[in-house]
């Protein structure tokens, strides 16, 4: 079936291509020198029309004429959002057109960082916005998130085509586009599945590259934070030329970027203070903030949890000393002050390092005036390194009576006790680095051409392959527990017990002295530290063919259409050396009943593939032109049929229109049905086990629970309905002003989700008195009502299911003003998003929960904040080569929760300010431009926001919302020849 489908697509393309010489010859007499050649026309995958206020005014959107690019007039700008060729005002779906110049002005690091400063992007995953706690998921890169609907529900494109996924989550790292060759980024802020297929639920981000670039561009820049860390360096070069009278066009770029990261949480204010919450989050016991919160069942020396010596701790030499429990704060397992264990902020990173290297090349050749051949290749490598958290055993380390390191007086005090448990933080083991690397290769070849003057066609083949590797240095628990069980051999030497009872197992075992901070030797440390390795290989093959043009003319203009189809195959192959489905060999090992080899990274296998066959049609009909009831009215409709080999056939559609009653006012609206298919990892992943520190409100105990995640082959595509409606204003009475306002309503049914992360499942189950679906995910040894410490949960399920419904509504606002002033140009721009509602229904048995204005929305490890207002306001002035300006990024106030109770539930608004300046030496060869950018000029901290999990494991703020880097300086020079 696959072969026949691909053959039909290729045969159609070949027939069209073979007809080109005759068509070109028959039409040659009708082509004048002033006609636009085919190489200037966008492919069907790139065709669209601008529909934001900025799109109607190229100066507002930052477009300007340069030596190597020519800005089109407003009516000629072509942006993403449709498969049709159209002039500037006829596409009904809202699109933000953001030029590279505007993005790098205030975010010179990467284009994705600049996008994340826009109010419509919320909850994106990046080194600064993600966490460094878990190594079992992708941390490298920048995965964009529109409207906090998830990185999997936004489609990332380059020049209108898909890129190979770069991790196991199905997403694509937006850092890996050729940054120096990107002209603009088109952000579709409405459903676009009818035009682009699966994943375009919250929208589309299309990185548009320079097609006719000639000359050379260079970039050198360095950056550093006000704290003297997180230094960055970027070097890039791009070049373009033509040959054979312009018929052959070559473009290439090479880029290198490195950022050191922030290697210690103590490097930022509050990062070393171990803030956390006390209380249970109920009305009777609300959460309250406390400093220096410690684990009361663990210490750096070894706290004795059970047996006749319970409540005391070890000292060096295996003797016993008193333990100060600190002050209870109404939450089991933690206390303020005392001798309890605290997270060592020096041992874990705040942000990982990041290094990217990129190569890109494109060749375009005009075979005939109406037939073009193109080929492009991109190769990227991204690496990061961080140190997640230190190693500890939270009250569950079993020590046996025959342990050789116990002092004689301790043995005497134990009496007849044969074993007891200890809680210990092993500071001596030190930092445990985790490295991730992504290598990706994308190849795109194709043909495009024209048939007569009204029809265009294109056919292309895309092939991509990515390889994602993680190498985490962690404690091998089988080795660790074998080493802890230290006894005296017959010759009097201290050895691992397993070498006596089971010779040949755990060869080379080095005994560990666990009693007292500093007792672990370097040899023992080196023995227990091993590499947890996992790898993901993604493959993408896609063939597509498109035809578009005009059918016939009506009284108001031509009826436009586009039809096409594509065949896509994607596969994933994930492997690891710590697959939790493979039973551990625990022969001869006492005190360890665990099922995983490593404390943090235990990744199951995932192997699978699916194929997708799609056909689409889109039609645009003009109904009014310069009539008594309006200047213009255009309606647009699209439909797509998609067949998945895993879940069958699904249809998507869109209908919309644009009405211009008078000059300067346009109204637009769309209604669409969109889908997101489950990712290969969501379908085929094996079980992945992670140990997480949680406070169990039922037993009032802090400990380590096992979170089990995996794939679900019964998953089906999510279905969404999207409504957008808005106005675009370009009043002629106020030259230079443009504005837009758009309402959106997105409702997703059968959403794929892990219903609750581990802490949320425990808290919500407890708050509901055991009557919540969250309780079904928790496994306890003694049932759901027993409140003793022995009933601490043994596992918490985190398998994805089609059980959730999500609905979000809001308003996007944009205002721009650009005018000449005092011999220069002033450019003002404001963007804002008003979140009216964000309702999440975890499954049909519970009521929807309103998350707008709170941080209740679950994220991968921590909550995502959803303020009702977010805005970015910028002002820039240019004169005689000098440009300077500033930007304010406003994060509105919000409540900490609408579900849980807090003593202080209100979080005030926070404003971050940025400044930039540049000067271009216009008379110097290369026209070098010196620039400086200062982000977070006032060194503003984010809102104070401790987490409820392990004290001190995270900086006490919401990373998805607030800046954690502090004031940051970037200096550099750009040139073009």
Show where each model-derived region lies.
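N-terminal periplasmic accessory domains that precede
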Residues: 111-114, 142-145, 173-178, 199-220, ...
């Amino acid at each position: 079936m696959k072969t026949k489908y691909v053959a039909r697509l290729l045969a159609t393309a070949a027939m069209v291509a073979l007809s080109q010489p005759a068509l070109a010859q028959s039409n040659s007499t009708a082509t004048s020198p002033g006609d636009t050649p085919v190489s200037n026309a966008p492919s069907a995958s790139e065709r669209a029309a601008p529909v934001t206020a900025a799109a109607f005014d190229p100066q507002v959107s930052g477009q300007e004429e340069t030596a190597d690019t020519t800005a089109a007039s407003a009516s000629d700008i072509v942006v993403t959002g449709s498969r049709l060729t159209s002039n500037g005002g006829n596409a009904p779906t809202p699109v933000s057109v953001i030029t590279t110049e505007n993005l790098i002005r205030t975010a010179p690091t990467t284009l994705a960082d600049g996008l994340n400063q826009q109010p419509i992007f919320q909850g994106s995953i990046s080194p600064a916005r993600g966490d460094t706690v878990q190594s079992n998921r992708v941390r490298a890169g920048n995965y964009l998130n529109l409207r906090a609907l998830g990185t999997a529900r936004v489609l990332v494109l380059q020049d209108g085509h898909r890129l190979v996924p770069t991790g196991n989550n199905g997403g694509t790292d937006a850092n890996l586009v050729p940054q120096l060759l990107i002209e603009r980024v088109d952000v579709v802020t409405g459903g676009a599945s009818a035009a682009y297929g699966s994943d375009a639920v919250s929208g589309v981000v299309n990185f548009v590259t320079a097609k006719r670039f000639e000359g050379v561009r260079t970039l050198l820049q360095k950056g550093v934070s006000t704290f003297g860390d997180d230094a960055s360096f970027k070097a890039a070069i791009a070049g373009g030329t033509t040959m054979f009278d312009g018929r052959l066009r070559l473009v290439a770029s090479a880029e290198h970027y490195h950022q050191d990261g922030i290697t210690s949480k103590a490097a930022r204010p509050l990062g070393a203070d171990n803030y956390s919450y006390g209380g249970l989050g109920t009305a009777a016991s609300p959460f309250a903030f406390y400093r220096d919160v410690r684990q009361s069942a663990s210490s750096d020396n070894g706290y004795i949890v059970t047996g006749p010596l319970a409540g005391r701790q070890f000292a060096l030499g295996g003797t016993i000393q008193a333990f100060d429990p600190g002050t209870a704060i109404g939450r089991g397992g933690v206390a303020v002050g005392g001798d309890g264990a605290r997270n060592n902020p020096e041992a874990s990173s705040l942000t990982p390092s990041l290094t990217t290297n990129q190569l890109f090349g494109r060749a375009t050749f005009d075979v005939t005036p109406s037939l073009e051949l193109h080929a492009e290749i991109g190769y990227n490598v991204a690496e990061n390194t961080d140190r997640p958290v230190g190693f500890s055993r939270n009250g569950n380390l079993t020590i046996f009576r025959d342990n050789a390191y116990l002092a004689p007086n301790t043995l005497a005090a134990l009496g007849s006790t044969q074993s007891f448990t200890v809680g210990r933080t092993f500071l001596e083991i030190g930092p445990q680095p985790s490295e991730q690397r992504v290598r990706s290769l994308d190849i795109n070849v194709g043909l495009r051409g024209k048939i007569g003057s009204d029809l265009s066609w294109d056919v292309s083949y895309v092939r991509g392959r990515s390889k994602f590797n993680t190498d985490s240095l962690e404690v091998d628990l089988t080795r660790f527990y074998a080493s802890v069980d230290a006894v005296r051999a017959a010759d009097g030497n201290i050895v691992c017990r397993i070498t006596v009872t089971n010779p040949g197992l755990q060869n080379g075992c080095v005994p560990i002295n666990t009693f007292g901070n500093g007792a672990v030797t370097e040899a023992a440390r080196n023995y227990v530290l091993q590499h947890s390795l996992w790898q993901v290989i993604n493959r993408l093959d896609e063939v597509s063919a498109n035809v578009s043009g005009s059918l016939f003319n009506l009284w108001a203009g031509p009826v436009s259409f586009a039809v096409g189809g594509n065949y896509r195959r994607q596969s994933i192959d994930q492997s690891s050396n710590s697959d939790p489905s493979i039973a551990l060999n625990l022969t001869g090992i006492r005190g360890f009943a665990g099922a995983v080899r490593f404390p943090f990274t235990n990744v199951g296998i995932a192997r699978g593939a699916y194929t997708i066959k799609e056909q689409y049609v889109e039609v645009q009909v003009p109904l009014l032109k310069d009539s008594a009831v309006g200047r213009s009215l255009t309606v647009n409709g699209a439909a797509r049929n998609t067949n998945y080999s895993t879940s069958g056939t699904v249809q998507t559609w869109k209908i919309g229109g644009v009405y211009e009653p008078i000059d300067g006012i346009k109204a637009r609206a769309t209604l669409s049905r969109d889908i997101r298919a489950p990712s290969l990892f969501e379908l085929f992943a094996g079980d992945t086990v992670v140990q997480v520190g949680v406070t169990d409100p039922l037993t009032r105990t802090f400990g380590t629970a096992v979170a089990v995640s995996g794939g679900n082959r019964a998953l089906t595509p999510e279905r969404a309905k999207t409504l957008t409606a808005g106005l675009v204003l370009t009043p002629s009475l106020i030259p230079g002003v443009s504005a837009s306002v758009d309402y959106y309503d997105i409702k997703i049914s059968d959403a794929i989700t892990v219903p609750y992360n581990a802490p949320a499942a425990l808290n919500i189950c407890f708050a509901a008195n055991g009557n919540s679906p969250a309780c079904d995910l928790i496994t306890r040894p003694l049932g759901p009502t027993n409140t003793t410490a022995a009933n601490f949960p043994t596992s918490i399920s985190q398998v994805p299911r089609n059980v959730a419904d999500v609905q979000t509504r809001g308003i996007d606002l944009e205002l721009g003003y650009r005018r000449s002033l005092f011999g220069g140009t002033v450019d003002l721009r404001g963007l804002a998003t008003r979140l009216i509602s964000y309702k999440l229904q975890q499954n049909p048995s519970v009521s929807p929960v309103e998350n707008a204005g709170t941080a209740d929305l679950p994220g991968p490890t921590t909550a995502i904040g959803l303020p009702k207002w977010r805005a970015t306001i910028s002002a820039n002035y240019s004169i005689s080569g000098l440009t300077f300006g500033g930007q304010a990024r406003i994060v509105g106030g919000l409540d900490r929760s609408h579900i849980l109770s807090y003593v202080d539930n209100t979080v005030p608004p926070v404003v971050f300010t940025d400044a930039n300046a540049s000067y271009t030496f216009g008379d110097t060869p290369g026209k070098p431009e010196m620039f400086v950018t200062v982000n977070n000029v006032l060194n503003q901290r984010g809102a104070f926001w401790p987490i409820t999990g392990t004290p001190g494991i995270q900086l006490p703020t919401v990373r998805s919302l607030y800046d954690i880097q502090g004031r940051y300086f970037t200096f550099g020079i750009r040139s073009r020849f």
